[in-house]
Amino acid sequence: MRTTATSPLSRFALVFALCGLIAACGSSGGGDGGAGGGGTVEQEAIQGKVIDGYIDGALVCNDLNANGRCDGSDPRTTTDSGGVYALNVPKGSTAPLVAEVIAGQSRDSDQPGVPVDISYRMASPSPAYSTSITPFSTLVHASGERNFSLAEDLVRAELGLPPRFTITMTAPADAGSLTQAVAKSIVTTLKTTAGTLDLSAANALKTIVAAFPPALNELPQLRITTKGNAPIVSKEIYVDATFSLTNPAASVQTYDLNGKIRGRGQSTWGQPKNPYKIQFTSDASYAKVPDFLGMKKNRNWALLADYFDRSLIRNKLALSLGSSSAFNDGLKWTSSGQHVEVVLNGDYVGVYLLTEDIRIASSRLNIKEMSDDPAVNDLDGGYIVEVDVRLDCYRGPDLDLQLITPQQVPFCIDTPDEEAITVNQLAYVKDLLRQVEQDLYGPNRIEKINPASFVDWYLIQELFRNNDAIFVSSDFMWKDTQAATNPLDRLLNMGPLWDFDRAAGNVNYFNNWETEGCWVSKPYQPNWISKLFDNPDFLALTISRWKQKRPALEAFVNFSIDTYARRLVVAQQRNFQRWPIFGLRLTNYYVFSSHDEEVAFVRRFLNERMAWLDKAYASPEAFNAMCK
């Protein structure tokens, strides 16, 4: 928190207000641009906290020479019993804040009255990022990334936390929470590395990660036992089951749950390693669960098998990218997924992605859930629809959730489903889809859609060259009520993203193993995306958003690939001992003999693809020549 020099602060304010009058107290050491011409440096007062618990007796400084410690002429102070500090710093200082937690002197409120046993340092990358100095802000600082939202994305990945997990701390985390457990593990690491860690070094984050305790490296485990060990043979009929979910990173590591399970999926269903749909029972056991591996609590989940994807990272990478700071301004919500190792009826069945399924809920796509009472006549949202060439949705004598538009685009009305939708709601959403299409193919207007959502969805799909994204299947859209707070939510939005296991070169048809050439923008079949590019405003928006997102996109993709591979290094060996499919041709064009080679191909494909798309998105003329 920044304050004016006359604002009331803690007991330290007066000292540093006076210090600001003395040139030596506030002189810059050259690591920050706050000094000017050797004269007196204008000061400003900041106030913050040092937090794991509240840290009392920690030395805090503005690290003007950026050497990762409090020394020289760095303005400094000491925290009080509430972890609070007040400090005068050069006005506009972008230099890091460093907290030195001192053995025998500093105390953590999580262990009242007990001095800290080992000295360690924490940091915040700058006062502008946060004046709270925490275990998480230390990793953000150690990343060296000055795009702080991107840095938080990267830190979450290293910690095995889902994309939307909050890592900002303004107070100690709740006792027993995942946040508290992970923060404690980070502090353990900072103590372990205290003698060698240089917080100012370019490789500081790598040094910290290399010393992570097992709790931050091991994958969670999900043990499923069906009633009577019954086999799961249907995508429609659930089997009762019990579930035991263990997260090594959490304080309470294991939760036992009741529920049911069935098959799911299309091409992967029927393969040796099957995908599943899980629904937990809302009972006393479920009530005790605060979250699912850091993902928001919900009863409904998908277990993605990723059988065809021998890197095991394509779905997680694409979904995490959609949730990242690079794309979450255009895509309102994207499913999160966490890698788990699954044991089914005592049989180890490999690495899966425990994934939020697509549904309207406060913990998922947070738009209005309409009344199913015809008398209410709730019509204008929210809806979820899917483009699906299989038309795999309900069609009965009274209700038909299938729609083939005049341009032959095949839709399924996903939400509300056949048990909840009213006749008037069904008519409303079908008419909306026809109107949007008529605007696109007639006067080429886009007033009824949120163009940023269509652009961002397209950019990720085109980057991954996703075979299904030309309006084949798993291409979702949604609309909220006309009373939604955000006006863009009242329009038809593209998303959420889904189904990337056979993307990023992992397919042997339509040349989609190649990194050059546009795919989603081509009119291979009825495809609104292709038609949208006839609108010059949509094309201009696509080019500008690509250029805006490009630096963060490349950093996120490469960093995440490294991180996922690191976290999978042991578990993938068990997965492929169970499923020895390296060297086999499934749906893939290229054949590789190891997990390392599979991961390297994903990296090469996406980096070469980004480089090619740079050329395609260089200008409208380039796009029209290369992508239409």
Regions found by a protein language model. Name each.
Residues F243-A249, I313-G330, N424, Q438-Y441:
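Zn2+-dependent metallopeptidase catalytic core
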Residues R2-L14:
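Bacterial N-terminal signal peptides that target proteins for export
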Residues S325-E341, N466:
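Short, well-structured beta-strand/strand-turn elements
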Residues P214-L317:
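Conserved NTP-binding catalytic cores of kinases and kinase-like/nucleotidyltransferase enzymes
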Residues P213-Q221, G228-I232, Y255-L257, G265-S267, ...:
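Middle-to-C-terminal accessory/interaction subdomains
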Residues A13-A23:
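Bacterial N-terminal signal peptides
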Residues Q279-S285, D291, K296-Y307, G330-W333, ...:
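Internal "kinase-insert"/substrate-recognition segments embedded within catalytic cores
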Residues C25-A215:
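Feature for extracytoplasmic/surface-facing segments of secreted or surface-associated proteins
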